[in-house]
C-alpha cells in the first residue's frame, strides 16, 4: 500500500466496521409527552453507554468494561501482543437520525451510526454483541436493533454488489519476507532511520521506529485483511496530513518512495 507512512514501513493496522443501532418509540403530541415513548430519550442512554465503552478502564471498577480490555491477556490471551502493537479498539457515534411527525411531537424512532475500529482479537460478531450487551440496549431490548451496515451503492453499470461494511484487522510479523524486503532496501539506501525533506517533515518522524503501523484504515483491509494477500506499506506524505484541508505531500517523499520501490527485489 502506498498510503502515507511518514517515512516508515508499516506492517498492519486496525480493522473497522460500521454499526447501526435502531431504537423504536411511540409518538404523541408534544404537549403531553407522557402519552408516548420518546425514542430519542432512550437512545440518549445508549449514546452514553457507547461513550463509556470507548473511555472506561477494564479493571472492574465500572459497569461497562472499556475497549482497552483487549490489551490485557486476561481478556485477549491469543492476540494481546498484536493488539498492543496496533493499539486498542475504539468506538464513536458518527451519525444520528430520527423520525417525528413534527417539531411539536414525540419522536417515534431514532437511529445512530457507530464507527468501530477493531484491534487484534476482535471480530465483527464480538463488536455487535458488545453493543447488544450495553445496559441501555438490554433495558430497551424489545425496541432496539443492532446491525452492521451493508454497502450497496450501484456501480457505473447499475450493478449492485452488496457487501458488509466490515474491513478486517491485518498485521504481519516484522520478520515476514515481504516486510523484511522493504526494511533491507531502506537500510541499503538510507540506513535505519526515517528520512524527510525538511524540518516540518522530520518533526513527525524523528525518533519513531522505522517499522510501525497506521492509525487509520487503508486498502490493506481488503488486500490482506479480506483476501489474505500479503501487504506492507511505504508511501509518501504524513498520516496527519491525510484528508486535511491543507494537505501536502513532499516532492522528496515521492522520489524516496520511487527509489525504494525500485530497490525491492
Would you name each region that the model predicts?
Residues 18-263:
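Metal-dependent amide/peptide-bond hydrolase catalytic core
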Residues 1-18, 83:
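Acidic/histidine-rich catalytic neighborhood of metal-dependent amide-processing enzymes
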Amino acid at each position: 500500500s502506498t498510503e502515507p507512512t511518514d517515512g516508515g514501513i508499516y506492517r498492519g493496522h486496525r480493522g473497522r466496521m460500521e454499526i447501526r443501532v435502531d431504537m423504536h418509540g411511540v409518538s404523541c403530541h408534544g404537549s403531553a409527552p407522557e402519552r408516548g415513548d420518546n425514542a430519542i430519550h432512550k437512545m440518549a442512554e445508549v449514546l452514553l453507554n457507547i461513550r463509556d465503552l470507548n473511555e472506561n478502564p477494564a479493571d472492574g471498577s465500572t459497569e461497562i468494561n472499556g475497549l482497552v480490555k483487549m490489551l490485557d491477556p486476561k481478556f485477549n490471551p491469543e492476540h494481546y501482543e498484536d493488539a498492543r502493537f496496533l493499539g486498542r479498539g475504539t468506538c464513536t457515534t458518527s451519525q444520528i437520525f430520527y423520525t417525528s411527525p413534527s417539531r411539536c411531537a414525540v419522536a417515534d424512532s431514532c437511529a445512530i451510526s457507530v464507527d468501530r475500529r477493531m484491534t487484534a482479537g476482535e471480530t465483527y460478531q464480538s463488536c455487535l454483541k458488545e453493543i447488544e450487551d450495553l445496559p441501555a440496549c438490554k433495558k430497551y431490548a424489545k425496541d432496539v436493533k443492532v446491525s452492521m451496515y451493508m454497502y450497496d451503492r450501484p456501480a457505473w453499470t447499475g450493478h449492485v454488489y452488496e457487501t458488509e461494511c466490515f474491513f478486517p484487522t491485518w498485521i504481519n510479523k516484522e520478520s515476514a519476507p515481504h516486510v523484511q524486503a522493504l526494511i533491507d532496501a531502506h537500510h541499503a539506501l538510507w540506513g535505519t532511520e526515517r528520512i524527510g525533506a525538511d524540518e516540518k517533515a522530520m518533526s513527525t518522524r524523528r525518533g519513531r521506529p522505522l517499522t510501525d503501523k497506521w492509525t487509520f484504515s487503508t486498502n490493506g483491509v481488503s488486500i490482506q485483511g479480506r483476501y489474505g494477500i500479503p501487504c506492507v506499506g511505504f508511501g509518501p506524505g504524513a498520516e496527519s496530513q491525510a484528508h486535511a484541508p491543507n494537505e501536502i505531500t513532499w516532492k522528496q517523499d515521492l522520489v524516496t518512495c520511487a527509489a525504494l520501490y525500485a530497490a525491492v527485489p
